[in-house]
Amino acid sequence: MSFGRSLLDHAIRYRRFGSFAALGARRAAAGRTYRAHAMHELLRRRDPAGPGWADVAGFRLRYLEAEWMRYLYREVFAEREYWFATDNPRPVILDCGSNIGMAILFFKSLYPDAEIVAFEPAPWACEAIGETIRANALHGITVHNAALAEMEGSLELFHDPVHPGSAVMSVHRDRMQGEAIQVPAVRLSRYVTNPVDFLKLDVEGSELAVLRDLASSGAIGQIRQMVIEFHHHMSPGVDMLSECLSILEQHGFGYQLTAGQVYTPITRGQFQDVLVHAYRK
């Protein structure tokens, strides 16, 4: 059995198992097998520096840099940061901060008939997503080359021109000290007119702006589950995580938090990625 087929089989098995509480030993065993396959493939790869093509879970993926591709692969497939369960065979998914589309492939491996609306401000990353979609004849995917904000218009996107495949691009200079290009900015609430099964929000520092927009417009009421990558202390010493959690609590969400490694003794105000897994109570 090929790695891609094996990984896809495990992804389907995860979908069938259901919630974390009900999985028990079967899910734990499947999880260990899934991670073992994924990490084996991650370490085995010897891709060119990039750009290039990679085989991922039975799909062909267009990437811009091999190292960043492996980094995204580890987050999305090996660590399953965006795994979710739903009874809807055609879930509506918002992928905010798509980069090269690794999560799009993960969602399609879980739910082949999913309807995915993706947002990515970097035009070169959007081109890579388009190539991946065409190479795999994928359907049900709409890609918007735009940043997400509280107000529509345009924003500066800061990026590293030496590393076009980097996952660290932002409209906030505190997050990326690089060159700037102008990109269109839209409000996510415009695109939330019907129930959304899952929202992935990884927008490099704009997550509060998006949540405020969803809350003020009432669109947050349409969302059933979400994973938010909150960039804690992106501006050193500025504490805003409580606002994120408060918005969720006020709109009927419970949540679990996972955070990146903390080194001791801690450094006050140190940057930290915090994953917020939010679900309807």
What are these regions (language model features)?
Residues 1-281:
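Phosphate/nucleotide-binding beta-alpha loop and adjacent structural elements of enzyme active sites
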